[in-house]
Amino acid sequence: MNVERLRKIIAYSNKNREEIYSMVKRFCSFTGIEYDSDLLNILQIVRSSFQKKDYFVFEIPFTDDEIGALCYRGDGLGYVVVNTSLPKVNVNFAIAHEIYHVFFGENEFASKVEFADDHYYKHEEEYAANLFAGMLLMPEVSFRRMYLKFRDESSGNEVDTIIRLMSYYQVPYMAVLIRCLELELMDGKALPEQLFNFDRVQIRQRLADLWLDESIMDASNRDDYSHIEKIVERLGRKYIGDEYINERTLKKVLHNMRELYMKIKGE
């Protein structure tokens, strides 16, 4: 990652931390979970919460491996589409990122997988969404405690500390590094450049070397579109019976869903 861009991320975090933290607490209150507890299954938590906001979450393997998720709203319904062709850690972060857009955002976005895209960081809302995701998935009290534990187990080695934290919280390498810098657990000026340029191959190898679960770098390629389509159709039939919508509206919703699905799949 470009060092100057990293400085901007940390500067944004320092300036907006309290505001974003209040959003994390509001989201946790909405879902009925403790805001300082570790999230073991982010998708399980958000699926029902999103439905209360009239958003459906479904997983599809995209042809574009640079997009983590899409947030789209139309026809009275919203869709969060998660790219399952990516490693599990990226999917987890993308889901948490989309929580911000659904609950607090003003725009629709295609969430990028990496932190190093210039266009991505032209939007302040994307800084906010990433800060939100980091705070939600790596709660401060827990993160500080586990950082000390894993640093001790790693004999002070920064890379191994980050890899262990990454495995524990099931989040991307760069997200962990940024969280460490946000909380001033590491001094960015004193860190070697190689720490900022660790690629997926190196991460997987280090996970193996440390006897950690390498599968967090695998893609599930899950495709549950047909399941979501059935849910939407069932709800649509109920709304037609209650005279909230008509047959034409339901057909339009299903048609738009199918078009979005085909576009994402590249078919």
Question: Which residues make up each language-model segment?
Answer:
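Active-site hotspot residues in diverse enzymes, especially metal/ion-binding acidic/histidine motifs
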Residues: 1-267
